[in-house]
């Protein structure tokens, strides 16, 4: 097992040179088809919150400026370890082909931003998918010896498929729900520069988020919003979240910048569940589908 321990969270820019190299399609398709994830865990023994960065994060995502860590913030911090793992371990896929398809975070209690934490990130759950291979990054955050937060980010590595007569399964299309009187409903105007602004706060400088020209180089007609910014924006809009909960989201169609979108949240008091989504303002198409449920026991 390849474990690496850091005394402090590594800065994202330290991996950029290797990330650029990883964009090159080294290896053949057969190697990716027979991929094996490294058995690796990267951890930070002393994780202290940068309060200036946290204030910027709260502001751009719409979280209340209080003394607690927003539920998506550790997912952002974990990306530095994830990038290090992909460039330093024998990672079987090119980073260029990765698509962030799902994200789950669980907060076991409200977490003070003045505490000192330990964070550990591992590869997990490589499996087949209709369009290639999926795998997870699993992140756990401890305060002293108590597990206070954990998250799973699921990525898809698209692979070329052999020709077959069998029809592939159809992708489920999420339609915009009908509004009820007790639903939360907002229109958001998302500016063209949100990707650049969020990149400087999160450290995620993926070129598809920064500018139309760089996005076009990767097949997108315009720059697209970060999925984790969109998720955080939803949770910030919901406001008073439970002390302990799980929030699962699936990323659907990209949000091209600039855009107008609709945010809709439906509340089910019987199950203590919230179902929410972000939708194109002019069509029924979904950009993100999510739900908030009670956190299961650790």
What name fits each language-model region?
Residues 1-26, 33-37, 98, 104-190, ...:
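HotDog/MaoC-like acyl-thioester-processing domains
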Residues 1-102, 168-170, 174-242:
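Hot-dog-fold acyl-thioester-processing enzymes
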């Amino acid at each position: 097992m390849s474990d690496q321990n850091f005394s402090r969270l590594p800065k994202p820019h330290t991996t950029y040179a290797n990330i650029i190299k990883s964009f090159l399609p080294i290896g053949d398709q057969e190697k990716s088809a027979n991929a094996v994830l490294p058995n690796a865990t990267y951890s930070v023994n002393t994780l202290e919150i940068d309060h200036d960065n946290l204030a910027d994060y709260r502001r751009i995502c719409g979280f209340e400026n209080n003394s607690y860590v927003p539920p998506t913030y550790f997912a952002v911090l974990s990306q530095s370890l994830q990038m290090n793992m992909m460039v330093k371990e024998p990672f079987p896929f090119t980073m260029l082909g990765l698509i962030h398809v799902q994200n789950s975070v669980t907060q076991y209690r409200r977490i003070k931003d003045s505490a000192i934490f330990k964070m550990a990130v591992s590869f997990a759950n490589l499996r087949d998918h209709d369009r290639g291979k999926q795998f997870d990054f699993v992140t756990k955050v401890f305060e002293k010896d108590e597990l206070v937060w954990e998250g799973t980010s699921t990525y898809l590595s698209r692979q070329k498929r052999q020709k077959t007569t069998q029809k592939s399964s159809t992708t489920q299309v999420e339609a915009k729900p009908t509004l009820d009187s007790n639903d939360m409903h907002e229109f958001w105007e998302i500016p063209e520069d949100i990707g650049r602004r969020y990149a400087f706060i999160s450290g995620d400088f993926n070129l598809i988020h920064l500018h139309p020209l760089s996005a076009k180089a990767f097949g997108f007609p315009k720059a697209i919003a970060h999925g984790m910014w969109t998720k955080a924006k939803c949770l910030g809009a919901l406001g008073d979240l439970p002390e302990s909960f799980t929030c699962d989201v699936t990323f659907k169609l990209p949000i091209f910048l600039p855009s107008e979108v609709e945010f809709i949240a439906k509340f089910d008091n019987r199950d203590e569940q919230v179902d929410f989504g972000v939708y194109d303002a002019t069509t029924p198409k979904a950009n993100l589908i999510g739900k908030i449920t009670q956190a299961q026991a650790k």
